[in-house]
Design a protein with these regions (language model features):
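N-terminal auxiliary interaction/assembly segments of multi-subunit proteins
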Residues: 35-48, 145-150, 156-157
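N-terminal glycine-rich anion-binding loop in soluble enzyme alpha/beta folds
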Residues: 1-39
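Conserved acidic functional residues
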Residues: 9, 70, 142
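Anionic-ligand-binding alpha/beta catalytic cores of soluble enzymes and soluble regulatory domains
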Residues: 121-161
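Residue-level preference for alpha-helix termini and adjacent loops
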Residues: 11, 15, 35, 58, ...
């Protein structure tokens, strides 16, 4: 049974984690989901990646890790970012394409990365991952392409920190 983990800043007081889990169950009924954390500080992408990077090695290879933290792009034409799917150390990661990958992977490794745009015009109350999951045709459906994403985004990460 495939395993999927969730790391979000949704918190636990509102229905949002249940909404995400319901969407996942509807889309991937045979997958088991586990929570890494839903108490990431609001909008703290760096904290979210740190928590995920610390936890993922304890899960079996082949696990899919979803990371969704509140954010918006500065691009006025499309304020909702694309997501990237990354194959790294035997795990799969789906996270916003916000320059976070260099924080997740070691410098000497070249992960496989594929970018997927958010294809809905009005994301559901800011929960872009919910909408992206509905539009996405399957986590392993398309072959991932080798790229040099890590080197390309080093300057952006240094600027963030």
């Amino acid at each position: 049974m495939p395993l999927l983990t969730l790391t979000t800043d949704y918190g636990l007081r509102d229905p949002y984690v249940a909404m995400l889990r319901g969407r996942l169950l509807s889309r991937f009924p045979h997958w088991r989901t586990e929570d890494i954390s839903h108490n990431i500080s609001k909008y703290d992408l760096v904290e979210a990646v740190y928590v995920l990077k610390t936890a993922f090695p304890f899960f079996p290879p082949g696990t899919v890790h979803l990371l969704d933290v509140g954010y918006r792009s500065k691009n006025q034409e499309n304020p909702w970012p694309s997501f990237i799917v990354v194959r790294y150390q035997g795990h799969w990661f789906a996270l916003p394409d916000q320059g976070l990958l260099p924080l997740l992977v070691d410098r000497d490794e070249s992960p496989l990365v594929q970018r997927y745009p958010l294809t809905v015009s009005r994301p559901n109350a800011g929960f872009a991952l919910l909408d992206w999951l509905v539009a996405y045709r399957g986590l392993h459906a398309e072959p991932l392409q080798q790229c040099h994403y890590l080197q390309h985004n080093q300057a952006m990460v240094r600027h963030m920190m």
